[in-house]
Structure formats: structure tokens, C-alpha cells
Amino acid sequence: MKLVVGLGNPGTQYAQTRHNVGWLVVNEVARRWGATWRKEKDAEVAEIRLGPAPGVKVLLVKPQTFMNASGKAVVPRLSFFKLDPGALLVVQDDLDSPFGLMKVRLGGRHGGQNGVRDIIRLLGTEAFARLKLGISRPPAGRDPADWVLSRWRDEEQSTLGDLVRLGADAVERWATAGLAEAQQAFNSTDLRPRPEPVPAPQPADVSGPQETGPAERPEV
């Protein structure tokens, strides 16, 4: 059995914010497999099976504790199902990666992500997998705490849709094939929008007018 946790904040006002990209990914996984979310203590959960029959049982989890207390929805479930940290994947936003980049990694510090910070604190180890989805640093002068709670801009929606789709693919690959294969398949993902190429300037015509001979007299 595997536990996949999408980090985010509860409430419709947060549903389309940068901090909730983890929720978008686990929602997409649940949608693909026809899973129904149900309310439990501190979380909404959905069960699916991935891979060839009988498949790998995966419990998708969306903490309902607000970001800073995410560990309360995660650690008791690991304990209840007698799972070690190697069975856990946390899907999170990542301020330190440009929007459009995605990476799967094992362990490491929380990097200022307070949901991950709380899971590490309650679990007592950093040794669990993360799927990190880049949301970029805020523009100069903008508070990061305000930035992560801001909504996606209209021009970001297309890239966001691709990022969520590939994030769901990465969750499925991790659950069925393991960490190394998920890293190999998805750590080169780069969906950053490319600027339109600027046409090269055309050289000016400096040849000048062409000399011509006298006009021929028409025959009569």
C-alpha cells in the first residue's frame, strides 16, 4: 500500500492558489480512476488501485488541517496502516523552482514549505519522497507568503494544466514502478513557456536603381 498526500489549504477561496497545486494533482489522479473522496478525521481521502490486477492500493490524502498542520493528517495514517516513510509521497508546491519545472526526489530539507516542515517534525525523518512542482519565486518586493496564496494568472492556465497532468502521471509511475523510474521519467520535465522568436531583420536594399539601355523603337 502507498500513501500519496497532496498539500494544500481547505476552502474554495484557496482552491486555485499556487499553494494548492498538490491538491490539483491528487484530484486529477482520483478523477482518472473514478475515485470518490470521503471525509475522515483531518483529511479527505480516496482509494484507488494502480497497475496490473490486483494492483497497488493507493490512498490519496488531502489534509483539511491547513498547510502548517499537515502532519496531523499524514503521520497517524502511516501508523494506522503500518507503513514506513518509504511508502509516502508528498505532492507539494516549490518556490525555489521555476513555474513549469517538476522533480521527484527522496528526502531533503523542507525548503520553507510549512506542510513538509510539519510532516518532518511529526514523522521524525526527512526520508520520504516528494513530488515538487515549481511555482517560481514572487516578483521583487512581493511577500512570498502572499505569493503562494495568490491565484494563477490567465496566461498560466495552459502550462498549469500540463503540469498537473504530468504530475498525476508521475504519481502513478512512483506508485507502480518506484522512485528511481519516476525520477528518470519526469525529472527532466520543463514546461516553462518559451518566448516567441523575434524575426531576424531583413537587410536593407542598397543596390540602387538598375541602369537600362535606350528603349527599343517598335516596328511599324
From Swiss-Prot:
Entry keywords, A to Z: Cytoplasm, Hydrolase, RNA-binding, tRNA-binding
Keyword Cytoplasm tagged: yes
Record site feature (Discriminates between blocked and unblocked aminoacyl-tRNA), residues: 9
Residues the record marks as active site: 19 (proton acceptor)
UniProt xrefs under Pfam families: Pept_tRNA_hydro
Catalysed transformations (reactions): an N-acyl-L-alpha-aminoacyl-tRNA + H2O = an N-acyl-L-amino acid + a tRNA + H(+)
Site (Stabilizes the basic form of H active site to accept a proton): 93
Subcellular location: Cytoplasm
Signal peptide location: none
First-level EC class: hydrolase
Any one GO BP annotation for this protein: rescue of stalled ribosome
Keyword Cytoplasm in record: yes
Region (Disordered): 184-220
One GO CC term, this protein: cytoplasm
SUPFAM superfamilies membership: Peptidyl-tRNA hydrolase-like
E.C. number: 3.1.1.29
Assembly and interaction partners: Monomer.
Family to which this protein belongs: Belongs to the PTH family.
Job of this protein: Hydrolyzes ribosome-free peptidyl-tRNAs (with 1 or more amino acids incorporated), which drop off the ribosome during protein synthesis, or as a result of ribosome stalling.
UniProt name for this protein: Peptidyl-tRNA hydrolase
